[in-house]
């Protein structure tokens, strides 16, 4: 089934199908492809930048895998919890190929389970959250285009030039599940706000701002807090335009996601102000990451000599990426040599 999607004010129209291609009897949806594409871009970004945050790439992979898998599961559970009456069987709950993920559920799940995975793999938690915040913006910016192919997550009527119209928007707005503030009327035959586009643009603008701020960050967790504030602020006003989310206070048009977004903004701003004042007098120092190989060697040395420690090396966060790479490689070479010599001594003894 295809949808004719039109932007009348711009003179544009697109014939869209939710299904990108099929493998046998299995349909592969654009929604899933957009999410997968965003995830791949976020992974590339994380691998390129992790050294600047004192994170070893090999250990980071385990954290990301756990965070992604359980984050997606949390996103689905959050979505189902918002409208449990739409799901009759466990198979309905598990059917996510064609949509049905709540971003805030994914964010919460990824931070919680990703944080636990960091503890397990010895990855610094707050620097990982900083990196994840930028990764989220990449994934969310790309993933929202899945809503475009599905023709979902759009807003109320608009007369703006970029207003969007399709049979899917018309059919949905004629249904009984539309949620709009009291006093707001909807005309199914009129164009609607392409809120997926608003959020995608908002995410990529936020990404550019946070990347520019990497060298200026004041404390570990700084970028993660700014991510929460930026995304929360955008989500709050974009959500007000939506017609498909749960209204908590119909008379005010207040939605569940707006409440979460407001809490993220208020809490994030308060913490940002407090921590910036606390750490403004000294530059942020990044502890260089040990490779997985060196941590394994260190564990062997600890078995024979529990009190043995490896000297840490730090670098100012504002240092160039090239310097981080050079110093991290040199540091790990020295540590590897030191640990191998220590193991040889123990073996000879």
Residue ranges and their predicted role:
Residues 1-349:
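A feature for loop-to-transmembrane-helix boundaries and adjacent hydrophobic helices
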């Amino acid at each position: 089934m295809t949808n004719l999607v039109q932007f009348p004010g711009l003179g544009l129209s697109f014939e869209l199908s939710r299904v990108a291609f099929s493998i046998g009897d299995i349909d592969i949806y654009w929604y899933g492809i957009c999410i997968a594409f965003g995830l791949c871009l976020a992974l590339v970004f994380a691998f390129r930048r992790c050294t600047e945050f004192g994170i070893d790439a090999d250990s980071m992979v385990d954290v990301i895998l756990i965070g992604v898998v359980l984050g997606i599961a949390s996103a689905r559970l959050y979505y189902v919890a918002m409208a449990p009456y739409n799901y009759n069987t466990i198979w309905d709950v598990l059917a996510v190929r064609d949509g049905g993920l709540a971003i805030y559920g994914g964010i919460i799940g990824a931070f919680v389970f990703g944080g636990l995975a960091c503890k397990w793999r010895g990855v610094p938690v707050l620097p990982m959250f900083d990196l994840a915040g930028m990764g989220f913006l990449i994934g969310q910016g790309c993933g929202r285009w899945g809503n475009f192919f599905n023709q979902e997550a759009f807003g109320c009527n608009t007369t703006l030039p970029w207003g969007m119209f399709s049979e899917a928007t018309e059919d949905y707005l004629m249904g009984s599940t539309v949620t709009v503030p009291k006093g707001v009327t909807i005309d199914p035959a009129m164009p609607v706000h392409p809120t997926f586009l608003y959020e995608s643009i908002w995410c990529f603008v936020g990404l550019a701002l946070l990347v520019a701020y990497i060298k200026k960050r004041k404390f570990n967790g700084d970028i993660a807090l700014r991510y929460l504030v930026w995304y929360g602020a955008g989500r709050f006003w974009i959500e007000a335009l939506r017609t498909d989310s749960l209204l908590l206070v119909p008379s005010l048009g207040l939605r569940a996601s707006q409440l979460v977004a407001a809490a993220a903004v208020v809490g994030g701003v308060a913490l940002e102000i407090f921590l910036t004042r606390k750490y403004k007098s000294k530059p942020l120092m990044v502890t260089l990451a040990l490779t997985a190989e060196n941590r394994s060697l260190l564990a062997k040395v600890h078995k024979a000599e529990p009190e043995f420690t490896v000297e840490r090396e730090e670098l100012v966060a504002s240092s160039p990426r090239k310097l981080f790479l050079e110093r991290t490689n040199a540091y790990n070479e020295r540590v590897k040599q030191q640990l191998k010599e220590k193991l040889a001594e123990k073996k000879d003894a």
